[in-house]
Amino acid sequence: MKDKIYARMTKASWRKDRFATGAFIAFVAICVAMISLTAVLFSNLTGAINHLMDTAKTPDFLQMHTGDINIEELEEFVKGRPEVRDYQILRFLNLENSSLTLGDQSLLDSTQDNGISVQGDGFDYMLGLDNELPEVLPGQVYVPVCYEDLYQVKIGADMRIGDRKLKVAGFIRDAQMNSMMASSKRFLVCEEDYESLKQLGNEEYLIEFRFVEGADSNAFKTAYENARLPMNGPAITRPLIKMMNTLSDGMMILIVLVISMLALLISLVCMRFMLLTRVAQEANEVGILKAIGISGKDIRNLFFMRYRWLILAGAGVGIGISVLMCQPMSVQMQKLYGVSENVLQGIMYAALSAVFVGGIIHFFVRRILRKLNEITALSALSGNVKTETKKTSRLCIALVTAIAVFLMMIPSNLYSTLSSPKFVTYMGIGNGEIRMDMRQGENEVLNKIGKLLSADQDVKEYALFQTSLTPVRTEDGTGMNMLMEQGDHTKFPLTYSKGCAPAHEEEVALSFLLSEELGLYPGDKLVVRISGEDRKCTITGIYSDITNGGKTAKLFVKQPDQKENVMWRIAYVTLTEGASRKGFIDRYTAEGAEVTDIASRIKGTYGPTLMQIKKVSVLVKVVSFAIILLVITLFIRMMIASQRNGISIKKAMGFRSMDIRKSFRKSCFPYIFAGIIIGAVSGATLGESICAVALKSLGAEGFRFTLNICSIIFNMILGSIAVIAAVWTGSNGINKIGAVECCRGRE
């Protein structure tokens, strides 16, 4: 009998205020949907990447090398390494981008090192879109899947390499070079075509190793370097490959996670206000129930029953929304990495996320309903129940507005930062206009380029650098090899989180991850062996670098001229005002250098990531606008409901509805606009700290937002429009309050 009475009272409560009931369900649904979506996307991404890497048999350690290889030395080394279960040498023919055409699209402006390769014998397979090994026939080529949309490539289209023509037979997923953040891309051809095209490019070798379970790749890398085996190129490990694959879509998932947690916070603030308002509105009923002997526990259970069913309904709706949103947000991910085999794991994560969110809201509602214990029968019936003050209510509105604007700011600021030319300084790339790369062994090209640049009237500033694997020794005698770039680092400096760039011959700087690994910081000493001589250097600074595994060093050398163990040579250039960038690039490309516009390089590397962030940014603006509109309208309506008697008294005294509305709006606007300003400032400060934590793990220490003033102003205007519309709409409820209500009591 009691249960039936409770059920009828619960349904009556829902019908009494359908807007508040719907809003409560909406808050729960949004929280469950976003956190479940984050969990499912993360599960699908990691599952798909792991499945692709396992199917492709990605190497655990890869050494790129240009030059001769002594096979016997390699085999002798492998025999003495019990952790190696398999190894192979793959050939990669690096082609000039100017000689490549896909369909009618030239690859001249590509920022990638493009080349052709054949299928691996024992591992490192390039897979078709069905995750099977494609059969490549003579005259056919398989194109990296990331180029399908980028260059609008269709199966059956022609690919031209110089004067040779191949037919595009399909697309491949290359677990090793799939991400646009990898600087190279492999096209798959048959052995016969590879040999016939050999004279059109520069051949490099991929020396690859697979380890037994539990092997230490860092220990192997040190042993490989100490054995002085071929290492004229960067070394890459399996964790680095996985990180590059994860980073692009992982950035989007990180943004969704931050937004989800903030949406949960907004929902909890709103629910608190809704519950306290409801308790105040139904104080009379609570007093009557207590007066007739109903226990406080039963009254709490009665109230909680209403919200328990709403929580369950909201969770169900939220899971449904996450299922609908998951597919469109996974399209790019599935194209690059395939479908995750852990479908059940994704479902389990979604269910656990829903339980997690539901549990938090369940606990929160129970805590708020303890306020019912403070209501006595006497205070309720005499109308002396304490309610939220007007100031507290308006502070809640300010908080919600601040969080919503903060939500808008994070993806906008992240997008403007990643698309800014300054962001290259976190990647280990100098902040110039042009970057010129010279291949290994081309010291004469570097010298020639240096002479041309010094005499070029279009050049405002330039600097030459060369990178080599350099032996170093710490003060405690520990020896190792560092990937060290030599040159004048006072020109085109990177972002230094501690100290400054090396400016003298006895100074060196370390990347953040290398500094953390070795425990070396500014002021510490390091012995560097250059051209057969030991040089005792002082560490002057720690810089950001997310290239080459994030572990590099910078040595000051006025004029880099080392000839041994040089892995690559580069130059940074800033042009004079009015100089033709395209003309400059064409001139120096003809001199044997690979010349790229740094802005285009960033766009090519981070283009897919930027597109994902831009989509998320638009989605967040829409969601935040809706949150402000819904939440502020709800708050205003509840504030009016809690002040209904006072408003009625004012009307009875002769105040017009228009005057009361104006007064009400004026009292709300200062709090609301304060919330907008706080949200904008927090987006530039707290948002920066949140993104910095994520990028720090990749080697980007000292991350700072590059703010776009137009974007900030637009977000603030958008928030203001939503707030004004919400206050205007919500305050119209004052018109429905009659002057006589104060005489006959609240209806």
Regions found by a protein language model. Name each.
Residues 62-64, 387-513, 522-524, 528, ...:
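Juxtamembrane segments of multi-pass membrane proteins
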Residues 293, 299, 654, 659-660:
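Glycine/proline-centered hinge or cleavage motifs at structural transition points of membrane proteins
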Residues 1-23, 280-298, 324-408, 412, ...:
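Feature of multi-pass inner-membrane transport and sensor proteins
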Residues 75-90, 293, 452-465, 594, ...:
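Short acidic amphipathic segments
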Residues 314, 318-334, 600, 607, ...:
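Juxtamembrane/transmembrane-helix interface segments of polytopic membrane transporters
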Residues 2-268, 277, 421, 425-435, ...:
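Membrane transport/envelope proteins' first extracytoplasmic loop
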Residues 16-45, 247-287, 307-322, 353-356, ...:
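Hydrophobic alpha-helical transmembrane segments of multi-pass inner-membrane transport and secretion
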